Amino acid sequence: MTTSTDRLSVTVAENKQPYFVEWADSFGPKIAGVKIIFWSFFFGAIGLFYRAIKSLNSRERMLSTLAFTLFLTSIIFSRYSGNSTFNGTNGLSLLFYALGPIVLLATLGYYYRLHYKSGEQERLKNIEFSSIFVLCFFLISLISARGGIRLVMMLVPAASILAAYLSVEIASLALNTEKSTKRTISIICAGIIIVAFIFSGYQFYKTSVATAAGYIPSPYNQQWQKAMAWVRESTPPNAVFGHWWDYGYWVQTLGERATVLDGGNAKSYWNHLMGRYALTGTSNKEALEFLYAHNTTHFLIDSTDIGKYSAFSSIGSDKNYDRVSFFATFNQDLSQIQERKNSTVFLYSGGVLLDADIIYEDNGTRIFLPEGTAALGALLIEKSSTTGEMISQPVGIFVNQDRQYNLPLRYAFDGELKDFGSGIESGVFFIPRLINGANGLQIQDDGSLLYLSSRAVNSQFARLYFYNEVNPNFELVHSEDDFFVAEIKKQVPSFNSSIISYDALRGPIKIWEIHYPSDIEFKKEYLSEEWPPELLRV
């Protein structure tokens, strides 16, 4: 089963429908491979159900509890993992998922009818309402957690109640048991569970402390705080910011300025328009017309948008996914440097499937590399041995059906955009890389590069953020360096790049002030809030 099937939802990580092996880890820790909290609330729910129906006879209680156990198991384990028999989408998984509630409802319905026909339905009124309420709360929370990662937190209160109930019930059983053997066993079980809970709490504490420490400093309390301080102090109070939706609340709260998009996705179709025209489009005019319709005064791009390009290019595509693309990272392989008479050839290794077909004529031979099947495996960059500048076009090493094709790329950016006038409509963008050398961390100039396919190489995003295009309509008014990049610049004054590759791509927050041409037209269609049906579904 899938819960999020529209373009926007499937690109939001929190909306992903989790597998059991993913969300169950939130209810650890493990002792000898056993998830303590998970199994505590699992058996706690079964125990509470058994207690709730104590007005029934032994046989009825036992069979009803078994039906409830099957019901609980079907909800949890019918979506176990992506590579298991129960992956949540195949026929067997769906059958098992449906079997649980069917068996439970059939069992309870059968006993209700039995008591009704015998005139004993009054016994059913003795079922504990409070227990049923807790179980309903738990089941709603459990189904919600199964439906989306962001809803796993809803399971925490109910799971905590049931885990605590299990320990209290076992402790109560130990205290009220007269037989010494049962009493001893119950006390031992209760002790083990209580100690396990204490251990779990301590492990959660350690994990939380370590996680919190890893987030300090973070982009939110360093780079974004500083960038938004500039926004508050240097832009008018009625300024309106355009950017990808992820940062809407940050700009609104930290920068105290209005935004076109926000984290709540109240008008999600505008995400499509922002992605299509302002970020992935190649027309400066269309980008301005969209932003003008929303009274946008400033435009913002954050370095994390580099990794999100695949998301907003998907959301911004037409029904044929004409904009879908990504920025693939390739790293320089120091073991495969080729020295020539007056130049050096560097190999950048990586690997990515093509996002669009490539058709290229080479000496009268037509080369066809299909999207999704052919791949780019590496890139060759030739530089002068004396000046260090590129002296020839980048060459992509493409592979299709066990055949290799070395094809030239038309564009390259190494301080400035170079258009070689021929080659496939793709390019590379060089980035310094921080590596662990013999003497500690070392900066490797042009140690990494991004491959920009034909769909992305001339996009608004690439031209503004990567190439620093001088655009009369988009004036760069502020650039806030990543915390790590800022520290490098302090220690290495000669370092002049705003982007570096270290664990991830670290770059600036760039803000442009928009200057609209006098003849720009207002287009009402950019204010539409309704998704065309053909664009909504994946």
Where are these regions (language model features)?
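Extracytoplasmic
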Residues: 177-538
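Hydrophobic/aromatic-rich transmembrane helices and adjacent perimembrane loops
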Residues: 90-103, 144-178, 184-187
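Hydrophobic alpha-helical transmembrane segments
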Residues: 47-54, 140-148
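Short linear interaction motifs
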Residues: 124, 134-139, 280-282
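Membrane-interface junctions at the ends of membrane-embedded or membrane-associated helices
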Residues: 49-58, 107-123, 160-188
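Alpha-helical transmembrane segments at the extracellular/periplasmic loop-to-helix junctions
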Residues: 2-116, 128-134
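Aromatic-anchored segments of alpha-helical transmembrane domains
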Residues: 68-81, 139-146, 195-201
